[in-house]
Amino acid sequence: MPIRHCIVHLIEKKPDGTPAVLHARDSELAESQAIENMLADLNESYNAKQGKAWGLFHPESGAHPFSGWLKEYIDGGSDFTAFSRMAVEHLQKLMEESNLSVGGHVLFAHYQQGMTDYLAIALLHHSEGVAVNAELDVTPSRHLDLGQLHLAARINISEWQNNKQSKQYISFIKGKNGKKVSEYFRDFIGCQEGVDGPGETRTLLKAFSDFVESEDLPEESAREKTKTLVDYASSQSKMGEPMGLEELSELIDEERPRAFYDHIRNKDYGLSPEIPADKRTLNQFRRFTGRAEGLSISFEAHLLGDKIEYDESAGTLIIKGLPTQLTDQLKRR
């Protein structure tokens, strides 16, 4: 993962309305193994974070100047240090306007992954710990707590430049308890939500369920294809990459690589060719299966409490909305 440019600034700020104090670095960080390790750990933590949103830049304006500064830097009109300095001064101003915000170390990193350029921005904080020194004494130790990542964003520079129709070249962490804590950071980037990750993932899972039902697949085959979908989505999420519908279709059925993709297009589910995988939604998508004495039951977990009701004390399942194929068979019995 080549790191093209990296710099860290410090903003001191308490959530009590006091002015934010900026300590800006004057030059980029020199290449080192420590920086490579930090960025690798940051990416791993960011990719694993649930509750991210995807979007695109607002049109450049006085309220949203970040994209203009980034374009100027990419086009060679300013260097990385100057770009980061303008950006962090803007962030300082927004922090002062938000009583909920706290300061921290602001990381800007321009790096490549494969053939793609990214810009990562994160507000980092220290944690207190302990270490054992060369004399075997236990001593206090401070370290960047990359596991507790609350405010961060990643911009796919390549997609932003080359795909003018894209609405998901920015990803950012949304606030857990309401939006207010993270609103100023989203405004700093100048980002508007363009893709509903959880909603798109739910629609994909609905399309897959419909596909399995329309294909009348044996239970074992349906279970294997479900596992393929979940494994692929989880893998893409871990890498911070979107799911490609054509690629997923090829994995689901190697003999008919376009079958699932054509099902999605023909039924007009309204899915984009690439969609972000929402981990929380995926975790709800697993199958309950059981077989005994000529009876075989298999259904997806998200149907429990909706189309399927389970009475534990009576040991019964109530199924609503039976498949038409099954009801037709029952009528002809």
Curated annotation (Swiss-Prot):
Pfam families: NA37. It comes from the Bacteria. One of its GO terms (cellular component) is cytoplasm. The keyword Heme does not apply. InterPro entries: Nucleoid_associated_NdpA (IPR007358). GO terms for molecular function: double-stranded DNA binding; single-stranded RNA binding. It is found in: Cytoplasm, Nucleoid. Keywords: Cytoplasm. Belongs to the YejK family. HAMAP family: NdpA. This is Nucleoid-associated protein Psyr_1083. It comes from Pseudomonas syringae pv. syringae (strain B728a).
